[in-house]
Amino acid sequence: MKLFGTDGVRGKAGEKLTAFSAMKLGLAAGIYFRKQSKTNKILVGKDTRRSGYMIENALVSGLTAVGYNVIQIGPMPTPAIAYLTEDMRCDAGIMISASHNPFDDNGIKFFNRFGFKLDEEAEREIEAIYADEALLEASQKSGKEIGASKRIDDVVGRYIVHIKNSFPKELSLHGVRMVLDTANGAAYKVAPTIFSELGAEVFVINDAPNGHNINESCGATQPLMLSEEVKRVRADIGFALDGDADRLVVVDERGEVVDGDKLIGALAMHLKNSHTLEKPLAVATVMSNLALEEFLAKAKIKLLRAGVGDKYVLEMMQKEGANFGGEQSGHLIFSDFAKTGDGLVSALQTMAFVLRSGERASRALNIFDLYPQKLVNLPIKQKKELKEIEGFEALMSEIESQGFRQLIRYSGTENKLRILLEGKDGRALEKWMERCVEFFKATLGG
């Protein structure tokens, strides 16, 4: 039985992800982690979705049923769970969130005791336990062996101190006017506190979660409101987080969204110039623009490409000994400070780069030109093996023969096909994209 996608278990709350399935997943995960338990503690956090309460209670029931003691810390960013799991010496950390997805979706992400996301082997083992009804039944405890759960509200201070320590001590945000969009999500309290304590004048939008407005026309996936607010208050910069605050989108003082690849390039240069890039390497994904690779090559920084997903970026970083990587979507990993993408660390590193440059954000972050690139997320009715679709390989060969780069893949969390085309001729690119969309609508029921 396949439960895990590209980023944990995810689905419509109350449909694919029910109270019953969450309880079973708690049982299965508890059985898995107890085999290597050190402290018999598991940390659980969540974002601000209404369904988070249902899933949290069910998950905790499963974990305590197999003997685990559970620490519940309420709404906190995903990277906070990763950090606090290790800091509080827990066997594992669990985040209940569907990240940037709509409020009626939810998900469950697992972290090991070192704060890293589980590898695929661990996920497969949990899936096998989940499907073994006899093992689930036999592993449940009774009497004094049943685990306990407790809520702790004061751990937020640990995370705030940790994030503030990632900002260079010689720099200050005094005099910086910024707008912060917390997407009505997990960082709605912690993010404004961090920037204010570092001296910035902070204007906060979308910081009033009500259970169903998370990511709604706001945050990292829809930064229009942020752009308008930056212009309205004449801010120096704007930052948008997503629902669980592991992703960052930057808006300059003109209200323009900074391209994710340009941000990766700027931050790689920031680390190199401050002598904190461990190796002349940066990791991005197959989605990143070729212009980023060429820009970094001129600076003698080699760009490595991983599969799509911050988990795969981190795996390649660890394998190659790199301490910086990211996705153009805004997942940026500074492994000196975080075990996963952290929007708040990324925002502070961006501010450090801009401050040291002495330039306005629009000039500091716009340091190379991109090749025309177009991405379409096409809703589809079915997923077929791409190579088995009649005419697929012929179409891809034709595109590549005209000098365009293509990347076609299914979303790991939604019924969508992601179509990416890139090349130097923008007009021809549009025509090829139209042809691709028509082809996949006809073959996949878009």
UniProtKB/Swiss-Prot annotation:
CDD domains xref list: GlmM
Catalytic activity field: alpha-D-glucosamine 1-phosphate = D-glucosamine 6-phosphate
Coiled-coil boundaries: none
Protein modification: Activated by phosphorylation.
GO terms, biological process: carbohydrate metabolic process; peptidoglycan biosynthetic process; UDP-N-acetylglucosamine biosynthetic process
Keyword Ion transport (UniProt): no
Phosphoserine: residues carrying this PTM: S99
Cofactor: Mg(2+)
Pfam families membership: PGM_PMM_I (PF02878), PGM_PMM_II (PF02879), PGM_PMM_III (PF02880), PGM_PMM_IV (PF00408)
Sorted UniProt keywords: Isomerase, Magnesium, Metal-binding, Phosphoprotein
NCBIfam families for this protein: glmM (TIGR01455), PRK10887.1 (NF008139)
HAMAP family: GlmM_B
Protein name, per record: Phosphoglucosamine mutase
Species lineage: Bacteria, Pseudomonadati, Campylobacterota, Epsilonproteobacteria, Campylobacterales
Gene transcribed to yield this protein: glmM
